[in-house]
């Protein structure tokens, strides 16, 4: 990512966010018209990974799905409290020679933004909150992964070789969606993973970055269940376009991306001010400044990949 120069900052119109806080900050949104664009800023306590700008993003079609798999994605936001977790509905779009794993919720929000006005966003802000921002393209380009994600309002892209996952098959079995599944375990990116796969689906793939088993991965979770993916639906007659955003990506590496993400997740307000040129003023219900909210914080969870440091 290229740093923003003082000259560019001076030219940039400063955008000031006044965030009214309820007694318990769970999620906050403000919509405003900026140069005839709709902008929505979402700051989520716990996981600050989403500041969504409600400006429609153009998409480039790179394929057409022939099968789609829906997954429930669950992850802890506080490893000391197993009741604090978040969920998302993810979709794995599969076509000949490649696949895309992305948030179905984010796809829905993007579609909704395109037909909504700023007034509608203000009236029903919860409709525009949620959804993971990352997408993973397997074998795109050939022999590699492409990973895209957002930090604040900035788009990032990195490529990596398709990783080798050394699975050990086990005698464990289970039934998911009527499919008899077999077990396997492996160590990958700093975690011990357990997977259940079936050879009754004509696809050798899986959620997130998983693959390499003699069948389709229906469920996978790490030791401690901090991260878990479970297949909850299969569409064998899909025809939805597989797309990638046409945006100015900051091309980076996996390690550098996680370092940038950590900067934002631990101190989002400073990141927004220094990188995005956005001044953030947080006030409570009484109208008084809440500087405690803008202080840096320590994450109560680990990223899904632990080996990046």
Regions found by a protein language model. Name each.
Residues 33-309:
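Extended soluble regions of mature proteins
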Residues 1-41:
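Bacterial Sec-dependent N-terminal signal peptides
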């Amino acid at each position: 990512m290229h740093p923003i120069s003082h000259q560019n900052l001076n030219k940039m119109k400063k955008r000031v966010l006044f965030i009214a806080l309820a007694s318990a900050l769970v999620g906050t949104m403000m919509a405003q018209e900026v140069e005839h664009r709709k902008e929505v800023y979402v700051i989520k306590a716990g996981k600050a990974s989403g500041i969504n700008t409600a400006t429609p993003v153009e998409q480039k079609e790179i394929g057409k799905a022939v099968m789609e798999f829906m997954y429930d994605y669950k992850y802890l936001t506080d490893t000391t409290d197993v009741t604090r977790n978040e969920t998302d509905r993810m979709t794995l779009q599969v076509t000949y020679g490649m696949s895309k794993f992305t948030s179905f919720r984010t796809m829905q929000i993007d579609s909704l933004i395109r037909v909504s006005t700023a007034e509608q966003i203000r009236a029903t802000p919860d409709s525009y909150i949620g959804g993971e921002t990352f997408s993973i393209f397997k074998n795109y380009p050939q022999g590699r992964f492409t990973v895209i994600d957002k930090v604040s309002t900035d788009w990032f892209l990195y490529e990596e070789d398709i990783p080798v996952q050394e699975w050990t098959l086990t005698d464990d079995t289970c039934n998911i969606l009527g499919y008899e599944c077999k077990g396997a375990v492996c160590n990958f990116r700093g975690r011990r993973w357990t997977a259940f796969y079936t050879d009754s689906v004509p696809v050798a793939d899986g959620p997130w970055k998983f693959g390499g088993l003699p069948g389709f991965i229906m469920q996978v979770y790490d030791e401690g269940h901090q991260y878990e993916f479970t297949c909850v639906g299969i569409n064998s007659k899909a025809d939805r376009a597989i797309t990638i955003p046409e945006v100015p990506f900051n091309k980076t590496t996996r390690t550098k991306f996680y370092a940038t993400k950590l900067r934002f997740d631990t101190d989002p307000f400073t990141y927004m001010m220094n990188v995005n040129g956005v001044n953030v003023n947080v006030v409570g219900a009484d109208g008084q400044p809440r500087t405690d909210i803008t202080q840096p914080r320590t994450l109560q969870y680990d990223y899904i990949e632990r080996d990046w440091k």
